[in-house]
Amino acid sequence: MSSVANRRTPALIVLSTGFVVLWLIIAAFPFLWTLWGSFKVQGDFFSRADWMNAIWGTRTVVETGGMFTGAGYEGAWIENQFWRAALNTLVIVFFTVIVSLTFGTLGGYALARSGYRYAFWLLMLALVFRAMPHITLVSGYLLPFFEWKLWGYKTTTVIVLVAINQPFTLWMLHSFFLNIPKDLDESAMVDGCTRFQAFRHVIIPVMWPGVVTTGLFSFLLAYNDFAVTAMLLSQENQTMVPQIAGFLGSTFEEGNVMFAVAAVVSATAPLFVLIVFFQRQIVSGLTAGAVKG
């Protein structure tokens, strides 16, 4: 009976496969189109006369002699030193993730193992702060940062990003710790471990997929941030996202859209690599956080 119920008809297979393929095309098309257009000139990629120019590169052939050109990448990475923004982003993201996970694992473990009612209300308070718009929180830091001459530095930006991200890491890691039986802690301490040693050598290895998943979400928050980095960083310490916005120009300054297109592709590609590399940990981590063990 079960084999009959699990047997899929050819029509169902075709329908499900077609749906998955359609979804993949819709999801991947914006990035693939931007990737293709990043090797064209602006007259082709943003052509109003014929959108097919973006495919055949009519203006690109006229201006550069070939269907493809790397002028956008050269202008962004070399002429405008986008590599400096990439390094700044790497530094800020790295320390934001490390600090967030350090405090998040310790705090989430303490709240999960605490039997007091205040743990719930602390998590609710953290959720309130997490729900607030980032721009609301950042504006409160501007005056003291200017007064204490701390504005423009990467260190202060890391502190603000950690403060904004910490409620999320607390909630997520707290749910992972709740799924780990307290018997593991007690068994480790019976064997001679202190509470911290049990946490470090027993609990963390068990819930490592959850730590990786939370770290990736923290990474994405800091990597994609615009409001905090645009308002708190000086020009020389600027990260990728605000600099991409700068490539688009302003009311008083003309930008170069193709520099922005090339920079967008450069900033997006590492995210695909990261997700593919950690996909197994992400799936197992999300599953562990969703199911009460």
Report the location of each language-model feature:
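A structural signal for multi-pass alpha-helical bundles of membrane permease subunits
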Residues: 4-7, 12-293
